[in-house]
Swiss-Prot record:
Lineage: Eukaryota, Sar, Alveolata, Ciliophora, Intramacronucleata
Gene: PGK
Full protein name: Phosphoglycerate kinase
Species of origin: Tetrahymena pyriformis
Residues involved in Mg(2+) binding: A192, D196, D352
Listed cofactors: Mg(2+)
Protein residues bound to ATP: A192, K197, G216, G290, E321, D352, T353
């Protein structure tokens, strides 16, 4: 399962991902298994035991949603875990501790000095063997991690493997949207770093008609294209090197790229920041940060949404957590909701964007809110 949920003060802040897997869990329990073992990661402990990333706070929320007790084990592999699982009875539900507390899950760890350390292949093999020993068949309901070559995804060696209901629902939505979209097809990308979204941008250029690039990652594009001063805005040096390549591909494919033309800037990231509007010509002065789309950009984005019949959105347009930098993302969501009501298909993904949708109480106003995205 993908129970990689945000925590606050030791409690689950947003249970969406847990709720997503409840139908699969209930279906399995209806079959009267001897036991059901749930495994997940939470955050990025980088192969080390980091208490703030423990799965333990998930237990009360999971018990509440299922209406039954859940047993928590403080590790995910090893003799004690194997014994506890072996002795389970009467459909007992067991939640394992964070898989990523072990370097063998991701194949690497980060040591105290901040260096990447490759996991020992023999240890990885043992880790996978221990996970495999915990069950007789394997169900993958973790859409958010299904693309990763991690031990829990690819190393659990059971002849019977199945997709859970959540994974199926996600794949059905995405395959329809990506393989036979109603056109025009618009993708909206935001967030901080270009390099994190290179593969996504490249693959979407092959499929879409228009692409909005906003949020922090837009400034790397604008600096490369217009040599624009971006002040203290986010800049991705690695991403900068491949902007030309991405734009050339878009041009060759006839994909229209929309970048911001003006920006709401702040002199800090905080709620009490002073604000100014800047544009492509003025650039952003030193000491100022582009934190949201400006009014002209908001209007241009609205026009692009109004033309679209399929919309996939991953990544906010600004620092929406602060009210004064929320309008670009909130207005875009309003436009996407209206377009959905008029018959368009809309898919929202990525942790931050999903948070925005929930805060704006718009979950029912878009076609599908994906559990994918995030760490």
């Amino acid at each position: 399962v993908d129970f990689n949920v945000p925590l606050k003060d030791g409690q689950v802040k947003d249970p969406t991902r847990i709720q997503g897997s409840i139908p699969s869990i209930k279906k399995i329990l209806e079959q009267n298994p001897k036991g059901l073992v749930l495994m997940s990661h939470l955050g990025r402990p980088d192969g080390n035991r980091v208490e703030k990333h423990s799965m333990k706070p998930v237990v009360p929320k999971l018990e509440q949603l299922l209406g039954t007790k859940v047993k928590f084990l403080n590790d995910c592999v090893g003799k004690d875990v194997e014994e506890a699982v072996k002795s389970s009875r009467n459909g007992e539900i067991i939640l394992l501790e964070n898989l990523r507390f072990h370097a063998e899950e991701e194949g690497k760890s980060i040591d105290a000095a901040g260096n990447k350390v490759k996991a020992d292949p023999k240890a990885v093999k043992e880790f996978r063997k221990s996970l495999t020993s915990l069950g007789d068949l394997y169900v993958n309901d973790a859409f958010g991690t299904a693309h990763r070559a991690h031990s829990s995804m690819v190393g659990v060696d059971h002849k019977i493997r199945a997709a859970g209901y959540l994974l199926k629902k996600e794949l059905d939505y995405f395959s329809k949207a990506l393989e036979s979209p109603n056109r025009p097809f618009l993708v909206v990308l935001g967030g901080a770093k270009v390099k994190d979204k290179i593969q996504l941008i490249e693959s979407m250029i092959d499929k879409v008609d228009e692409m909005i690039i906003g949020g922090g990652m837009a400034f790397t594009f604008l600096k490369r294209i217009h040599n624009m001063e971006i002040g203290n805005s986010l800049f991705d040096e690695e991403g900068y090197k491949i902007v030309d390549q991405l734009l050339e591909k878009a041009k060759a494919k006839g994909v229209k790229i929309h970048l911001p033309v003006d920006f709401l800037c702040g002199d800090s990231l905080e709620a009490n920041a002073n604000t100014q509007i800047h544009d492509l010509i003025s650039g952003i002065p030193k000491g100022w940060i582009g934190l949201d789309a400006g009014p002209k950009t908001i209007a241009l984005n609205a026009d692009a949404v109004a033309r679209a019949n399929t919309i996939v959105w991953n990544g906010p347009q600004g620092r929406f957590e602060v009210d004064k930098f929320r309008q670009g993302s909130a207005d875009l969501l309003k436009r996407v909701s209206a377009r959905t009501a008029a018959g368009a298909t809309s898919i929202i993904g990525g942790g931050d964007t999903v948070n925005l949708v929930q805060q704006e109480k718009a979950t029912d106003k878009v076609s599908h809110v994906s559990t994918g995205g995030g760490e």
